[in-house]
Every structure is written in structure tokens, then in C-alpha cells.
Amino acid sequence: MAIKITFLGAGSSVFVRNVLGDCIIHPELEDLTFALYDIDAQRLEDSYLMLHAICAHYGKSVKMEKYVGVEELPQALTGANFLICAIQVGGYDPCTISDFEIPKKYGLRQTIADTLGVGGVFRALRTIPVMEMFGKMAEKYCPNAVFLNYSNPMGMLSGYMERYCNVQFVGLCHSVQVAVPKLFAGLGMEYDSRVQWKIAGINHMAWLLEVSKDGVDLYPEVKRRSKEQGYPENDKVRHEIMHRFGYYVTESSEHNAEYMPRSEERRVGKECRSRW
């Protein structure tokens, strides 16, 4: 069965490489068409060439189409089975910089500003009109497509799309997949396919409820190493949260320092705030 995947924001080369690159090498996915859409022609071309290089490296054949600008969006959407969205409206400079600088001016310091707080709201207000446009056009040109969104703030965008667009919408984040491997790497623990874990929670703050290997609970060893070795330099906030609440969280210490800057001030807050 032919599958058409439309990537909205295909100038996001890292997401294109990781997501569509996985699709290219996955043996169950054959007869693929990638419709790559962006408003930046040069960045779109870069992603297009990168995907061709990946196909050549793995000896795969994938049909690829490029679409630039809103005028070509209907063609990109028509007949799509899946939509993948990874956009940043306005670019990093000046928009994202302002998400930090404006709140900071009034004493509200943020370290990531893509999830909640003033920066998260700013980003949502910029992004919602574009997401709504995608959703309304998807209703017309690919009404049965599944809309997979990687854009932040994922929670706010997902809530809006669920309420105001008639599309099958799913919000995703890569932090769940990488949380346990990164935790183990920071503690010098071996990670392989036998490690099993269960995670549940909200975006950018899901909780690692269980982690085991061959039926053996590994949480005691994780906590022992964390205490005895000291918290990894780049992950102090999450380790502090784990020892206070009993569970490790999926999103980075940079994110969590922003969520709870006062609760962690005494032990790791000052260091994290200056570092991040």
C-alpha cells in the first residue's frame, strides 16, 4: 500500500533526519512518498538533499516532492496519510530570543520557554494561527490523515487543535524515548534491549514509573549510584526531583529548573539557573 507522508516544516533538518530517516530504513515501510513543505526554500532544499543522501546510503528508493510557500500547501496535503509537523514560527531571532528577554526584564527568568509560562504562551500565540491553517486545510485535502505534531508548546497546541479542528491529532515528543538511555549513560549503567520501562504523565514532565532488566527492578541501583556518585553535572535537577519524589522525569534538567525554580533553589537552583 502506498503511503504519503507530508512533513510540515521540512526545513527542520534534525527532525526530518530523525523521523523520515527512520521511515526510510524501516523494513515494513515500502512504497513511500515524502511531501516536504516549508516556507524557507533553502532550508527545504537542504533537507531534500539530505534525505536523498540517506536513501542512497541505505539503498532505498523513496519518491520525494518539494513544496514551498502557502500557495503550494494544498498540493503537499492532497492525499496524505500522515502529516508530521515541526515548525517554529518567526524563527529563533528575534522571536524566540524575545520569549526569554521580555519576561527576564520583569524578573521572570526562563531556561527553555517552550512549554509554559510567559515564553510558552508567546510561542503558542505565534504558532496557533499556523497550526489552525494546517488543520483546516487538512480537513479539506486529506480528511483521513493522522496529524502528528512535534511543535511546542505541545500541550497548548494539542488542546487548541482538539477543540477547533476536525483532524486526528496526536502530540509527540522524543524525550520519552531517550530518557532511560540518557539516565543510564549518566550513571555508567549498561543499557540494552532487555531494559524495560514504563512511563506515564504529561508532555515535558512524564514520570519513569518502572525500570527493570530480566525482571529485576533497577530503580534501587539507579538511586544508589545517583547518591554515591553525585548527580551528573548536566542533570542535577532531575536527580534531585527523583530523590525527593521517588521517580525520574523524562524532560531535561533545563526544563525542570524552569518549572520549579524556587523548590530547588537551596540545593541546585542557583547552580542550574546560572548554568542554564
Functional labels for PLM-detected ranges:
Residues 157, 275-276:
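Short amphipathic alpha-helical segments with coiled-coil-like heptad repeat character
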Residues 2-99, 112-113, 120-191, 203-208:
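Metallocofactor- and cofactor-centric catalytic cores in central/energy metabolism, strongly enriched
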Residues 188-274:
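Long, compositionally biased stretches enriched for glycine and/or charged residues
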Residues 102:
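Short, well-ordered surface patches within globular domains
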